[in-house]
């Protein structure tokens, strides 16, 4: 019997029909959702395509397992939403480059699976963190997993503002550092398993307090 508030089933079991959205499918991006193929570059390209072509919008992620090995940047007003009988899962591969040592020049002293930024990040550009003017960014109905060998990995960096959220996400931090660094606006139905921390944070973006609803923490080491 489940004795805690979060529910971990997929809340979007059918493919949404949205002619304005983009879909991260093998047909569109030549990827495999098998947990073996590294989809990092294809995923970043898909996110950037939404931003460039629409400026705001949704990238739908079908059920499956998606291996990544580097930070994925999500610019303002872009949402990643999963669908299927089971939630899709993004997996940070074992011993991914850059996740073994503390990042001394970074605000959170870490590297991130997904970093919500204020603007588009092209290859070679320095990311600009989300801020009080970063609206509508989100991730929903997607699970995240950090595999072994990534002690300074954090699943999400979320310093965004109004209408932005994380919802219906289970984060398997394992031996990584944390599930989330820098809170923003709202999180709902998020579960954190393992890690040194579930969440560690500085202040929220100015003017936007944070609401946490129906979330769960288990097995943090600190």
PLM ranges: what are they?
Residues 1-60, 68-147, 152-155, 159-167, ...:
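Extracellular "leader-to-stem" segments immediately downstream of a signal peptide or signal-anchor
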Residues 65:
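Mobile, glycine-rich extracellular loop/lid and propeptide segments
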């Amino acid at each position: 019997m489940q004795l805690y508030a979060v529910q971990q089933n997929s809340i979007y079991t059918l493919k949404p029909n949205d002619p304005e959205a983009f879909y991260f499918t093998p047909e569109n991006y030549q990827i495999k959702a098998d947990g073996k193929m590294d989809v990092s570059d294809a995923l970043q390209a898909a996110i950037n395509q939404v931003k460039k072509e629409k400026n705001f919008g949704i990238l739908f992620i079908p059920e499956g397992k998606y291996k990544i090995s580097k930070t994925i940047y999500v610019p303002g007003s872009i949402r990643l939403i999963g669908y299927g009988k089971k939630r899709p899962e993004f997996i940070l591969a074992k011993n991914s480059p850059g996740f073994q040592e503390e990042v001394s020049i970074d605000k959170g002293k870490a590297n991130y699976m997904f970093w919500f930024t204020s603007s588009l990040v092209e290859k070679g550009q320095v990311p600009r963190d989300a801020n009080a003017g970063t609206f509508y960014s989100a991730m929903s109905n997607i699970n995240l997993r950090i595999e072994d060998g990534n002690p300074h990995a954090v699943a999400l960096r979320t310093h965004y503002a109004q209408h932005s959220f994380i919802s219906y996400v289970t984060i398997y931090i394992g031996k990584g550092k944390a599930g989330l660094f820098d809170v923003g606006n709202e999180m709902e139905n998020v579960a954190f398993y393992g890690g040194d921390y579930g969440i560690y944070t500085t202040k929220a973006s100015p003017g936007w307090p944070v609401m946490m609803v129906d979330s769960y923490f288990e097995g943090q080491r600190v």
